[in-house]
A protein has these predicted regions:
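Glycine-rich phosphate-binding loop of ATP-dependent small-molecule kinases
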Residues: 1-147
Length: 147
Protein backbone atom coordinates (compact mmCIF):
# COMPACT_ATOMS: atom_id res chain seq x y z
CA UNK A 1 0.00 0.00 0.00
CA UNK A 2 1.33 3.43 -0.91
CA UNK A 3 2.17 5.89 1.82
CA UNK A 4 0.39 9.23 1.69
CA UNK A 5 1.94 12.44 2.95
CA UNK A 6 -1.04 14.66 3.79
CA UNK A 7 1.07 17.81 4.05
CA UNK A 8 1.92 17.42 0.35
CA UNK A 9 -1.75 17.51 -0.68
CA UNK A 10 -3.24 20.94 -1.27
CA UNK A 11 -6.52 21.67 0.50
CA UNK A 12 -7.54 24.08 -2.24
CA UNK A 13 -9.32 23.11 -5.42
CA UNK A 14 -7.25 23.46 -8.59
CA UNK A 15 -7.82 26.80 -10.31
CA UNK A 16 -8.57 25.19 -13.66
CA UNK A 17 -10.27 21.98 -12.61
CA UNK A 18 -11.81 19.80 -15.32
CA UNK A 19 -15.06 18.78 -13.62
CA UNK A 20 -15.72 15.87 -15.97
CA UNK A 21 -12.22 14.49 -15.41
CA UNK A 22 -12.61 14.88 -11.64
CA UNK A 23 -15.97 13.08 -11.72
CA UNK A 24 -14.43 10.20 -13.69
CA UNK A 25 -11.50 9.95 -11.25
CA UNK A 26 -13.91 10.05 -8.32
CA UNK A 27 -15.96 7.20 -9.80
CA UNK A 28 -12.80 5.12 -10.14
CA UNK A 29 -11.83 5.81 -6.55
CA UNK A 30 -15.34 4.94 -5.33
CA UNK A 31 -15.11 1.53 -7.02
CA UNK A 32 -11.79 0.95 -5.26
CA UNK A 33 -13.26 2.10 -1.93
CA UNK A 34 -16.10 -0.39 -2.36
CA UNK A 35 -13.61 -3.21 -2.91
CA UNK A 36 -11.55 -2.14 0.10
CA UNK A 37 -14.65 -1.96 2.27
CA UNK A 38 -15.61 -5.50 1.25
CA UNK A 39 -12.14 -6.71 2.34
CA UNK A 40 -12.37 -4.76 5.59
CA UNK A 41 -15.70 -6.40 6.42
CA UNK A 42 -14.63 -9.89 5.31
CA UNK A 43 -11.37 -9.88 7.24
CA UNK A 44 -12.75 -8.12 10.35
CA UNK A 45 -9.20 -7.50 11.59
CA UNK A 46 -9.13 -3.73 11.35
CA UNK A 47 -11.44 -0.75 11.42
CA UNK A 48 -11.28 2.65 9.78
CA UNK A 49 -11.97 5.96 11.47
CA UNK A 50 -12.47 8.99 9.22
CA UNK A 51 -12.60 12.41 10.85
CA UNK A 52 -14.18 15.21 8.86
CA UNK A 53 -13.44 18.58 10.41
CA UNK A 54 -14.49 21.91 8.97
CA UNK A 55 -16.32 25.11 9.66
CA UNK A 56 -20.10 25.31 9.29
CA UNK A 57 -21.15 25.16 5.62
CA UNK A 58 -17.70 23.91 4.57
CA UNK A 59 -19.08 20.85 2.79
CA UNK A 60 -18.81 18.12 5.42
CA UNK A 61 -22.28 16.75 4.65
CA UNK A 62 -21.54 16.84 0.92
CA UNK A 63 -18.44 14.70 1.48
CA UNK A 64 -20.50 12.22 3.47
CA UNK A 65 -23.09 12.01 0.70
CA UNK A 66 -20.78 12.07 -2.34
CA UNK A 67 -17.90 9.94 -1.09
CA UNK A 68 -19.30 7.60 1.52
CA UNK A 69 -22.86 7.36 0.20
CA UNK A 70 -21.81 4.74 -2.35
CA UNK A 71 -20.44 2.33 0.25
CA UNK A 72 -22.37 -0.52 1.86
CA UNK A 73 -24.43 1.26 4.55
CA UNK A 74 -24.24 -1.80 6.83
CA UNK A 75 -20.50 -1.23 7.18
CA UNK A 76 -20.49 2.55 7.66
CA UNK A 77 -21.87 4.77 10.39
CA UNK A 78 -21.58 8.45 11.19
CA UNK A 79 -21.31 10.14 14.57
CA UNK A 80 -21.79 13.89 14.85
CA UNK A 81 -20.30 15.46 17.95
CA UNK A 82 -22.49 18.26 19.19
CA UNK A 83 -22.74 19.78 22.67
CA UNK A 84 -22.14 17.01 25.23
CA UNK A 85 -25.20 15.40 26.81
CA UNK A 86 -25.61 15.09 30.58
CA UNK A 87 -24.45 11.47 30.37
CA UNK A 88 -21.36 12.43 28.35
CA UNK A 89 -20.50 15.19 30.81
CA UNK A 90 -20.64 12.68 33.67
CA UNK A 91 -17.66 10.85 32.13
CA UNK A 92 -14.12 11.90 31.19
CA UNK A 93 -13.29 14.04 28.18
CA UNK A 94 -12.74 11.20 25.69
CA UNK A 95 -15.50 8.85 26.85
CA UNK A 96 -17.93 9.72 24.06
CA UNK A 97 -15.15 9.40 21.47
CA UNK A 98 -14.24 5.91 22.70
CA UNK A 99 -17.93 4.94 22.79
CA UNK A 100 -18.24 5.89 19.11
CA UNK A 101 -15.05 4.17 17.91
CA UNK A 102 -15.56 1.69 15.06
CA UNK A 103 -15.70 -2.05 15.65
CA UNK A 104 -13.41 -4.32 13.62
CA UNK A 105 -14.56 -4.54 10.02
CA UNK A 106 -16.45 -1.26 10.25
CA UNK A 107 -15.95 2.28 8.98
CA UNK A 108 -16.89 5.08 11.36
CA UNK A 109 -17.05 8.69 10.27
CA UNK A 110 -16.82 11.45 12.84
CA UNK A 111 -18.60 14.54 11.57
CA UNK A 112 -16.47 16.90 13.62
CA UNK A 113 -14.32 15.59 16.41
CA UNK A 114 -12.97 16.01 19.89
CA UNK A 115 -10.17 18.12 18.39
CA UNK A 116 -12.68 20.92 18.04
CA UNK A 117 -13.12 20.89 21.82
CA UNK A 118 -9.42 21.62 22.19
CA UNK A 119 -9.78 24.78 20.12
CA UNK A 120 -12.97 25.93 21.84
CA UNK A 121 -11.52 25.48 25.32
CA UNK A 122 -8.56 27.69 24.44
CA UNK A 123 -11.05 30.49 23.83
CA UNK A 124 -13.42 29.50 26.65
CA UNK A 125 -11.29 27.79 29.33
CA UNK A 126 -14.29 27.62 31.66
CA UNK A 127 -15.66 24.80 29.48
CA UNK A 128 -12.83 22.58 30.72
CA UNK A 129 -14.57 22.41 34.09
CA UNK A 130 -17.28 20.24 32.48
CA UNK A 131 -14.68 17.70 31.35
CA UNK A 132 -13.96 16.35 34.87
CA UNK A 133 -10.19 16.48 34.53
CA UNK A 134 -8.49 15.47 37.79
CA UNK A 135 -6.89 18.44 39.56
CA UNK A 136 -8.88 21.07 37.65
CA UNK A 137 -11.72 22.36 39.79
CA UNK A 138 -11.65 26.01 38.71
CA UNK A 139 -10.29 28.06 35.83
CA UNK A 140 -7.44 29.11 38.14
CA UNK A 141 -6.27 25.47 38.22
CA UNK A 142 -5.57 25.55 34.46
CA UNK A 143 -1.84 26.21 34.21
CA UNK A 144 -0.07 27.38 31.03
CA UNK A 145 1.58 23.96 30.81
CA UNK A 146 -1.90 22.43 30.34
CA UNK A 147 -1.99 23.85 26.82
Amino acid sequence: MAKIKLSAISTRAPKKADKEKLKAETEKILVELDELQNRLIAESKHSLLVIIQGMDASGKDGILRDVFGSLNPLGVSVTSFKAPTAEELSHDFLWRVHEAAPAKGMIKIFNRSHYENVLVTRVHPEYILNEHIPGINSVKDIKPSFW
